[in-house]
Amino acid sequence: MPQPPRVAVLHIRTSRPHAPAFQAELDMLNDATLAALAAEGWDAELVAVTERPADEVRRLARAADVVLVMGGEDVDPALYDGLTEYPGSGMHEPEADRITFEVMCEAVAERRPLLGICRGLQQLNVALGGTLHEHMTGHVVKADDPFVATTVRAEADTDIARLGASAPVRCSHHQAIRDVGDGLRVTARASDGTIEAIEHIDAPVAAVQWHPEYPAVAREQLAPLVRALLARA
C-alpha cells in the first residue's frame, strides 16, 4: 500500500508577543491547513523556520513530498533593493527569508513540489530575482476581518485553472509582485491587474497570493493545488 504524501508546512514562528492578534490569525490558517491535508490522508508537519536549526529545516523540506510555505511578515526589502520605509512596514524576518529562499531554490533546481501562499508567493518571486510593490493602495480591509473576498482570473492550461477560469478567493495582503522572477510565469490576476498566482515554467513549483487554506474553502482550494504539483513531479 503506497505511503501518504508527506507535507512540510513552513511558517515563521509559533509566538508573537508583540502581535498576538496576528499570531492568532496565522495559527487559524495553519490549523486549517493541517485539517485540510489530514482530510486527504496526507501526513503534514508544521515547521517553524525561526525556531529550528537551518540544517533541520532544509532536511525536513528535502524529506517531504511537497513543501508549503505559509504567510507572515513582509519580505525583507533589502533582498530586492526595495524601500526600507513604506506604509504598513513593520517587523521583517531576514533569517527566515534566507533559509526559505534556499529551500525554494533547491526545490526549483531538483524539481521538488513546493507551493507558496501569500508571503510564500512574494518570497518565491524575490528568491528567483523578482521585485515587489512595497505597498498597494486601494486594498480595503475591514477592521473585524482582514480577509477580502475577491475574484481571480486564471490563465488557461495552468494548475490554477483547475480551480476554475474565474475563482472566488480570500486575500489579505498589502504587497504584490512588481517584476516577475526568473523562470516564473503569471498564472492568475485580480480584476485590477494585480498578479495573484505564479508558477515555474519547468519545476513543480507554484505560489498564490490569496489564501486557499482559509477555513471556509481549504478543502476545495488547497488540496487541488497540492495534488496538481504532486502530479507534475
PLM regions and their residue ranges:
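Gly/Ala-rich beta-loop-alpha elbow adjacent to hydrolase catalytic centers
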Residues: G116, G120, N125, G129
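Short catalytic/ligand-gating loop segments at beta-alpha or beta-beta junctions
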Residues: V169-H174, I198
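Active-site-proximal beta-strand elements of phosphoester/diester hydrolases
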Residues: A206-W210
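Short beta-strand segments that buttress and anchor functional surface loops
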Residues: V186-R189
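N-terminal beta1-alpha1 cap of cysteine-dependent amidohydrolase-like domains
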Residues: M1-R112, V126, H133, T137-V148, ...
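Active-site glycine-centered loops adjacent to acidic/histidine catalytic or metal-binding residues
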Residues: C118, H173, H211
